[in-house]
Amino acid sequence: MATGGGPPDEALSDQDLPNWSHESLDDRLNNMHWNGQKKGNRSAEKNKKKFVECDLRLTNDISPESSPGVGRRRARTPHTFPHTRYVSQMSVPEQAELEKLKQKINFSDLDQRSIGSDSQGRATAANNKRQLADNRKPFNFLPSQLNTNKEKSKSPPKREASTRSLTKDFLASALNKDFLSNSQAFLEEESKREPAIDSSQVVSRLVQIRDYITKASSLRDDLVQKKDLSVNVERLSNLIEHLKFQEKSYLKFLQKMLASENEEEDVRTVDSAVGSGSVVESTLLTFDVPSEASDTTGVDPRQEAKEELKNMKKQHALLTRMLQQQEQLRTLKGRQAALLALQHKAEQAIAKMDESVVTETTGSVSGLSLTSELNEELNDLIQRFHNQLHDSEDPPAPDNRRQAESLSLAREVYRSRNSSTSDTPLEDKSPLFNNVGVLLEKKQKMDTLLGELHTLQDQQLNNTAFVASSVSPRRSTEQRTLGSAVSSALTSDNRAARSPVTIGAYQTASVNESEDEENQNPAEKLKKLKEVRKRLNELRELVHYYEQTSDMMTDAMNENTKDEDETEDSEYDSEQEDAEPTTNIRNPQYRSSWAQMNINSNNQSGTNNRDERQLNTECEINNRSAVNLRSFNMPSALDCLYNIEHSDKEEDGNRELDDEDAEDQGSRASLSSQNSVADDVQSVDFEQKFNRLVAAKQKLKQLQDLVAMYGDDSESEPVAPERSFSGDQFPPEATTLKQQPNNTRPNVSKAQKDIALKEQAREKFYESKLQQQQRELSQLQEERKKLIEIQEKIQTLRKACPDLQLSTSSAGTNPANRQNRQMTTTTSTPDVNTNGNIVVPAMPDPEDSSSVDNEVWSEIRKHQILREDLRQRRKQLETLMAEHQRRQGNTETTSAASIRSDDSDTQGLQQQTRTEKTMATWGGSTQCALEEEEEEEEVDDEECLSDVHQIDIEEDEQDNTSCENNSYPQNSIRKTSFNGRSSKDGWKNQCPLSVEGNHRPSPKTRQQQNVSMRRQENYRWMSELSHVEEKEHWQEQIDQIKKQLDYSTSICQTLMRDQQALSYLLQSMITTPYSVMPSNVGASQVQLIMHQLNQCYTQLNWQQSNVLRLKQMLNDLLVQQPQHLQGESHQREDRGSSAPPLTSPNIFPNFSFLPPTMNLLNMPAFGSIPNVVPGMNFNPVFPHGFENFTQNVASHTDTPLQPHDQNTSGKTEYMAFPKPFESHRSNSTEKERNPPKKPDESEQGRRVWVENHQKSDQEKKPACFGAGLSAGGASAKLAEESRKVKQFDEVSVESLSSMPDPVDPTTVTKMFKSRKASAQASLASKDKTPKAKNKKRKVFHQKSKGIKSCGFQAASASSASEPNQTTCKHAQTEEVVVGNVIKTSSAQRVEKESKATEMSSEAGSDVSMFETLRDTIYSEVATLISQNESRPHFLIELFHELQLLNTDYLRQKALFALQDIVTRHVSEGNAKKHETCTKALESTGWMASTSELTPSESLVTTDDEMYAKNSDGPVCQEGEQNDGDNISSLSTSSNFEPFATDDLGNTVIHFDQALARMREYERMKSETENGLVADCCNNLNAAASSLEGTNDEARGRAQHSVDDASGIPCPYIDSKQLDRQIKAIMKEVIPFLKEHMEEVCSPNLLTSIRRLVLTLTQQNDESKEFVKFFHKQLGSILQDSLAKFSSKKLKDCGEDLLVEISEVLFNELAFFRLMQDLDNNSTAVQGTVSRKPEAVVVLESFTKEADKEEKTCPEENFSATRETDDEDKDKDETETAEENRNFDAEVLSGKSDISEEDDLDESLPVSISFTKAETQALTNYGSGEDENEDEENYEFEARPVDVQTSLETSSEIADETEKEEMEVRPEANIENEKALSLAVNVMGELSIHEDQAKSDCDVLAHPSLLLSNEKATDFSGTALVNNVKSPVDSPGTSGAGSSDTESPVLVNDFETGSGNLSQKSDEDDFVKVEDLPLKLSLPQEQIMKDIEEEENKNNLCDEILNINDEENGADQLAGDPLALKEPDSPAIHPA
């Protein structure tokens, strides 16, 4: 600062400086990131990594990490301090924008105390790392120091060293070089610029600039504070940097001006200032003022400028003098200023440290005189060192480099950058070499003082405990840094001359240690610290000097520095000590005997930093604590540990070498440091410890190998090696990760501990850990034995089920397990370790992790890559396994897998919960967590071994690292958890059959889940977390319940033994034709057996009452879990629980009857047992829908009514669950209604089964997996099937679809088989989670699939769980909509809840039911909320509605209402399904299932298709479902989860009323128009069923096959039509938006947009009230949705706005259309409108489903494409946001409609991107089909009429083609289209398909189109006409034109005779025959004939299901695409 340029820079930076000084060092470091300084290297890298971690911390560790320094930091940087450090010249708009961003981003201060001051600073710094470089360099000296203190408070260990180094480097380097060079450069530059400019102008400019900087800084700080590390922050940082540069330039210029004026004066002033420190003061005036200002919330920039002017005058003098002075003086004075700053900081820090280690800001500078003296002495020393450097050999220089490096690699870099500069000053300072001797003496004294200070600080820190430790590590680091700096100089001296300084260093080091040991009193330490304060300041100055010296030396050594690590290590090692050259690069630090502690720590840090930051951090941390304590030995030990770790990774020999080296080095260091004894002792200890570690690691490896050998047998063996490798390789890293946190903590704890105590404790810990590890190893060995036994059992199971086991276990599980294990080892270890890190030391760990050396990171990266590879392979394996399982006993495999999954999930997930959570933070960690769970569960023992191995290593290392206590406890915890898992696994192993059988499949299942979960890894993540947490909460309960169940099982077994005969009878009967039991087994026998079983149950009932209560809780939990795939996992776990009972499957099979009751509760738990027991299966039927069982028993075996009795007895308690199963009961009730047809019922059961099955398929797959492994023999297989059925039923109980099977075991068996593929697929989605990758995913996936309904169901179910109340409303609506779906899952849950509530009331567990459900409800609600974040109004309304369900009575009433709806719908729907669809199983499967799952219909359809696909390629299924999940999650996650529509939420508000109204209207219209009064909308339930499964539509189908076919699709809502309609609307909206693109979204504009949209979506339906209701709802939703865009520039939010509008429109129109669709004859359209929320929910599900199905069906071949579409649409959503700007014609062109085709043929204007529309309501513009943008515009203009209605959308492809044609020849097209539409409408069948295929219209819009058409047909031919494409439809009509949407466009289906034509008679709306494409030359009669033929030939279900077969993707485009004239807009496919 005395240097000419320095003051201006400082003055410039001073504003920043205060802030920086207050900000974390990282901020300054990062921001300043002294460009030329070496600090950058290590400290910069550290800072970078820290910053990375800061980011992590900001995200993860902000509070904790920053918490240590919160108070401190807060004290330093008053939160009140304006963050306007960096005021930048931001334009007002930019500032406003930043403000907006800040406000927007500033969700919370992120604990601004910590973040604002530190994290924010760090984040800002990170953003500004290089930006402030020169600007803040001077300032950073003080800020660095101050911040160093802060940093001490923060992450003292890590930042400490970097801070010290940075500070020193900054001070030395920055002052020397930046100030000198930069200042001069600037000054000269300025002088060159405008020396004549008035200083006042410059001052005003400076003031302005500083004001800008302040503003920009504040903005950036705010942004950073808000974690907004966005481009804005970077821009701000750049701006600030630029401004500061200008400021600097102006200051320099001003100073130069002033200097020119006051040059002489100032020279003298400078001289005096130098002596008196006024220079620093003058330079610091600005600093201090700003710092004070920052402390006092900022000084007016102008005041600052004025003060700066004053300062600048002074500084001008300084500058003048600087100009006069040589760079030597400038460097010296810069150093002086830096030293003064450092001293000031150090004094403050010391004072605060003394006062309160936390408070580190006070303290008087040792004195300017000292500084000046030090400057002189430093100059002398520098010269001497410089001379010595020249005189000395290179090795000393490398040593210095290394030590300097230890000081700071960054510094070296800086030095290398500024080497010439510092050399020059050094040369200038050559006269000072004379003073080197004196300075060396002083330095020795300083070193001694440093030693004392270190001792005091260390001791003080130790005494001060954590606070002190946090500070002292820093200080120690500082001192070590100082020492290392001194040592660096000394080392160079040592090598060069072995100068006394070196001796001083040694003495200092020894003194430090001795003092560390001696001065352990905090008081003494404080005193000495105070005394040492000056000394420390002096030492700091010396450090700076040394840094400078090292800089000079480094400059001299820079060439060498680059080769320093190895070369210097070798040189240094060889020179210093024996040549342990490169091997112990880490250890050279130790080799740096002179500064063993410091250098070890520093070099360790430095070298390790180069190599591995984390390790450096460890080392630093350890060195900070340990080095402070035993920095010498600790670093050695740490290095040894570290080296051993890595050496272990590399070679034990290397470890030993490293240990020896470390020991030798430690000894050498000790000898060098004269503390050889302690070091030797420690080194010996460490050596022993290391040997122990090595031995332990070897043992662990051996154990791992053994475990690997035994774990998977042949398969595990390769895995074990992998794991060993991964474990050995990565775990050390992981260990390092753990260690680091451990080190971090131990630093604290050990900081508290004395060195000796630490060593002793360390030894104790090592011993204890070794003992524990030995115990754990013995445990692991025992577990390994168990695993071996399990393996044997598994082998037995494999023999029993060779295909299953081999394929599942071997092919899938084992490879997966290998991968999983390896992943587990890798993932688990890293993740687990990470968990340990994150969870336990999470805050420091991220830093450590982030700080971990590049090596660690590279290895971690490698492991992650390997993990990804493993995941990919696992996915492949899962795919193969899924197919294999499908081919093989899907049920068996699935059952076993499910069981296994349950076990593994239960056990694994419980503990994995954290792991998963933690892992979630790691890329694939979540999956890894799951995999780990699997692995850990299966491989827990092995994993534990590996983990223990790692842990042992970690523990040893950590112990060595002095992280023993914390490390080991964590490790112990991990081990405990692992052992717990192992124990659980052991327990599972105790139940090897189901457990193992499940064991292996489970990994598969879980792998499959993981497959899809990987895709939706993040998605699953949420619900899983909640579920995992829930699991954690109730896992114990589950375990207890399982124990009780086991106990009950044992009792039941005893009872069953008493009834062996019955068991045998049951088994024999069941073993005989499985269906015989329920259907044919002598009723008397069955009754007798059931009666006896009931007696047994009665005996057990008291137990079961308890067990049932527990099980009810379990089931509730499980119900929740099914909702979350984890629920299924939990069920799997429960199955696992039941799996333990499975250990006595035969007994339980006998006892299975009890299990039914228990199985209802136990189904998950005893699910295996039920599976085991065919007879049990008989009961599983009951358990599955135990209600159903009772009913079904009544149906199947009236005697089983005793099961009824069971139900009665168990049912009272049990009823709660049967009630949840009452959906099943509904099914079973239907089946019971059907019972007369028990065979039929079997069939119906099949159908229901199919429906359920398809639902269940998802569930059944898990069931299949679970069951698959359950049994070993035929009976076992049967039992498995029973088990499967049961598990399936369990799962299916989830889906309620198993019931039919349980009801009719035959059905179950048959359906079970038929389900295998689909069930597996479904299970994959549900159980496996791949389908429903998350339980959320499950919901989503279901959602996405039409699982939308299911998902919706799940959502409803979730809601049903908590929002049971809302679900009652929603579920009523939804169940009306989703009906069966919700009924199935939601109703199941709800029924479970309601019945459980009932039964709970009956069982006295009413509260417990809801309490049990509460977690699920919370998780569901959390999921719901998270998924509906985009529609807060929905959530608000939903919760408002839920709040209304404030009593159990209301809840039960709602649940019962749902049950009634579901039951009625199921009974009616199933009857009609069976009646209506002969394609029954599949058609009915998905149609009936659709009835249940109206959205799920698509799900089912999608499932069937997907199942077929999945059978063909589970990947597609997963992908599709993933796409569906993603899409539905994306589009419907907000839409669907929230019950698929925001509207639903709004609707829900008055949904009952509106729904009642809508239903009434629907009823009226359906009566009047459809004549389907009784069938369609006669009942709300009819409407509900129409909504649900379109059962009414199914009824309609019964009346109208077209209506039937279309009926299903109707609720299925053609997303294409919707997409088209929305596009049409958006075509109008987008131009409007474009017109106002530059405007701000004012309320008026938004209102105009809303009105425009509403106008475009005007429904001309007769049912004005529904239309009004719809529009009112839509308007309110639009208003709500658009409100968030208020005050934003349209161009900024236009995409989002369009997306929002399109999403809302899609939801609303889909709902509206769904409501219409509910009116199978578009009569109900009005009702639909009123019911739209419901309809939208289902509709969206359908629409998405439909899109998915359309994609699925038409695109079966395009499945991938569809997936791609979905993905693309997902992308498109994002892209659409971008492309939304392009959204004009493209999207509107209906391209979204042909999204599939777009994927196929981007040129195709039509794309079924409505998935985007689904995903992005705004598919219209945002469908990502922007390429059609022009076309869309053209279409808008060319055929504004051609607003595609949803009907039109269904024919969207055709329409697109037609559009192309129509645009080419719109009228003819319209006519043809209209004719076709009419024909299609009349036919309403796939014939349209053909006709349209014939006709240019790609009516081939396929089933989806047909669906749409059928919908339209149901609603009106208009829909088909629209589908065909009513180009006439105006954009508005597209919104309102489609009959589905009641858009005027709807040309009523003449067949339906709905008034839609008249209603929609708007000419624009009418698709006129003349408007139809000319290509549609077929007369209407011909078309109708074709349609009829097509319809006769093709069932819509068949068509949809078979679209792949019937139509290729190319064929899907009906008509001759080549015949289509390319529309003007190129977007339309030129074909």
Swiss-Prot record:
List every stretch annotated Disordered.
1-82, 111-165, 469-495, 550-590, 649-678, 712-752, 806-835, 882-1014, 1123-1146, 1219-1247, 1318-1345, 1514-1533, 1746-1802, 1817-1870, 1922-1965, 2007-2031
Q: Which residues form a coiled coil?
A: 302-394, 523-549, 684-711, 757-805, 858-892, 1025-1049, 1550-1599
CC terms in the record's Gene Ontology section: centriolar satellite; centrosome; ciliary basal body; cytoplasm
Q: Output compositional bias ranges, type Acidic residues.
A: 562-580, 930-945, 1824-1835
Q: Which domain of life is it from?
A: Eukaryota
What keywords are annotated for this sequence in UniProt? Cell projection, Cilium biogenesis/degradation, Coiled coil, Cytoplasm, Cytoskeleton
Query: Which GO terms of the molecular function aspect are on file?
Result: identical protein binding
Query: Which residue ranges does the record annotate as region Self-association?
Result: 1-484
Polar residues composition-biased segments? 114-130, 469-494, 581-590, 667-677, 736-750, 806-823, 888-898, 960-981, 1004-1013, 1524-1533, 1843-1852, 1922-1942
Summary of the function given for this chain in its UniProt record: Required to anchor microtubules to the centrosome. Required for centrosome assembly and function. Essential for the correct localization of several centrosomal proteins including cetn3 and pcnt. Probably involved in the biogenesis of cilia.
UniProt similarity note: Belongs to the PCM1 family.
Instruction: Please give the subunit comment from the record.
Output: Self-associates. Interacts with cetn3.
Protein name (database record): Pericentriolar material 1 protein
Q: Which gene underlies this protein?
A: pcm1
